[in-house]
A protein has these predicted regions:
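Polyanion-engaging groove/track-forming segments
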Residues: 1-226
Length: 226
């Protein structure tokens, strides 16, 4: 408060939670979508996490069609979409069906593997990892890191540079500790949430021209000049 009162710029040297990162939202939305059996709300939380190859227009079209046709379960996603609603052009329905096929190519194998009731932690982690790879998440996070670097957002760039490794490390620990344990989807979600809630990223100061506030254990000062 004293620094703020005297308008002295400062940086608080502490690790930040990762829970607001799009990759974390992607993971949590995936799990909820499976648990909720592809409910309307869970599907659109997943689609709008910002890490899928869908345009805003494509997401809007899907949303309108799902609402209009009452598509709110995994079973309905597995069936071909051929019906129009509200006098919709049949050609538009063909485009919407193509979007469904694209998403099913991405999601079907992952969904079926994760829906196995007595799957082990290792099996669920493997399914999740392979799904992440198929979605090219690491490359997309790298692209975001480069964007933030180019726009001078050093803290964000640092976050995106660390987040993938943090999640992979969490997966490794889950396998090492509980790998052969059979867990339900809900139990797997609880394990994942517990790990993610503890995950933190280290952020570097955006500027050297400021007071650095930290503790003796974490903060290291090099080449100090007075």
């Amino acid at each position: 408060k004293m620094l703020e009162r005297y308008e002295i710029p400062c940086f608080i040297d502490e690790k930040q939670t990762v829970l607001m990162n799009p990759f974390i939202e992607f993971l949590r939305a995936c799990i909820d979508m499976l648990i909720e059996n592809y409910s309307y709300e869970s599907v659109f939380r997943f689609l709008r996490c910002g890490l899928l190859d869908l345009t805003e227009e494509e997401m809007d079209v899907l949303e309108n069609y799902m609402l209009g046709m009452g598509i709110k379960s995994w079973k309905k996603w597995q069936k071909e979409w051929t019906l129009a609603y509200r006098g919709e052009n049949p050609e538009e329905v063909v485009k919407i069906e193509a979007l469904r096929v694209r998403l099913m190519e991405l999601l079907e194998g992952f969904t079926l593997r994760m829906k196995v009731r007595k799957a082990t932690v290792s099996e669920r982690v493997r399914a999740f990892y392979e799904f992440i790879v198929s979605c090219r998440i690491q490359q997309k996070l790298k692209k975001s890191e480069q964007y933030f670097e180019a726009h001078g957002e050093v803290g964000k760039a640092k976050e995106y540079s660390q987040i993938y490794a943090i999640v992979m490390d969490l997966f490794d620990k889950m396998v090492q500790v509980l790998g052969e344990e059979s867990v339900s989807l809900r139990e797997f979600k609880e394990l994942l949430e517990a790990g993610l809630s503890e995950a933190k990223v280290g952020i570097i100061p955006p500027s050297t021209d400021q007071v650095l506030v930290g503790d003796m254990e974490r903060t290291r000062l090099k080449d100090i000049q007075v």
